[in-house]
């Protein structure tokens, strides 16, 4: 790879990417023809990016020294802190360090606090959409940082994301990602509970899965009710009041029917019972009886 190294000091490269794993590699690929510098501890991970037009660096420090924006997609808080410190030690003032890993918000905030002493800005910019979204360049990215840093990141992030949103100050992107992933993984547990009920009832799980994927693509799934700016109780004159009251009535009816079937079949469905108990309140219909 000696012919594909980052240029010497003095020639400034715009974008660098550190961490070329399952998510980082496809994200970086969308930037490869745009003067991208990359680094990964595994040389074999850099080879496809070099073939696509990127330049391989010998170290994190080498990427940081030549790039105005350094994106980092590594495993956890410890790796983010380690890589972040290497970037701070080598980057020039004015550099933006973008952390795409899912970590604690405090880790991003602490890194940003240290970075300010070097004149470097940090944005926490975790992504949602998985490997398929990264490969297609259709991820959603939730950015926490200053207005100026966000504007500098918006265009390069758009190379691999269809939705680039400024969530607030540093830490806000990570908090949004944790809430989003909480919904995602709770839904997996709910799916397992629904499958147990369907299996006990003699329903084909594969066919049921096809139905779920098909209809969620049409309705938007759980995101279809995430339309309000607050979780406070709805006022009767709210534009969404009648819509969500109708949703509440249908949901409570169908949950009750599912629980009745579960009781008949002896299937334990604790999440469904919690959902029925809290469904109306969750929609903002507190203390309002069904019609």
Regions found by a protein language model. Give the residues of each.
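Rossmann-fold dinucleotide-binding core
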Residues: 15-18, 102-181
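Hydrophobic beta-strand scaffold residues
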Residues: 36, 56, 121-123, 205, ...
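Helical "substrate-binding/catalytic lid" subdomain
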Residues: 173-267, 271, 278-291
């Amino acid at each position: 790879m000696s012919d594909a190294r980052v240029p010497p000091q003095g020639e400034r490269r715009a974008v660098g990417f550190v961490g070329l794993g399952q998510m980082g590699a496809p994200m970086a690929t969308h930037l490869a023809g745009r003067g991208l510098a990359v680094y990964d501890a595994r040389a074999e991970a850099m080879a496809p990016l070099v073939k696509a037009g990127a330049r391989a660096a010998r170290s994190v420090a080498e990427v940081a020294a030549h790039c105005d924006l350094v994106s980092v997609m590594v495993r956890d808080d410890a790796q983010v802190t380690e890589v972040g410190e290497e970037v701070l030690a080598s980057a020039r003032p004015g550099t933006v360090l973008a952390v795409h890993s899912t970590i604690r918000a405090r880790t991003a905030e602490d890194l940003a606090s240290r970075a300010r002493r070097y004149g470097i800005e940090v944005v926490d910019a975790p992504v949602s959409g998985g490997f398929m979204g990264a490969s297609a360049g259709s991820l959603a990215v939730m950015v926490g940082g200053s207005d100026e840093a966000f504007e500098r990141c918006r265009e390069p992030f758009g190379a691999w994301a269809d939705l680039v949103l400024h969530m607030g100050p540093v830490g806000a992107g990570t908090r949004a990602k944790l809430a989003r992933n909480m919904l995602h993984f709770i839904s997996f547990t709910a799916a397992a509970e629904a499958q147990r009920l369907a299996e006990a009832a003699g329903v084909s799980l594969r066919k049921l899965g096809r139905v779920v994927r098909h209809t969620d693509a049409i309705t938007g799934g759980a995101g279809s009710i995430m339309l309000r700016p607050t979780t406070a109780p709805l006022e009767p004159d709210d534009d969404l009041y009648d819509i969500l009251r109708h949703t509440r009535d249908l949901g409570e009816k169908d949950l009750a029917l599912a629980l009745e079937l579960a009781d008949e079949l002896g299937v334990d469905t604790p999440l469904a019972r919690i959902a029925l108990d809290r469904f109306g309140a969750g929609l903002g219909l507190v203390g309002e009886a069904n019609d």
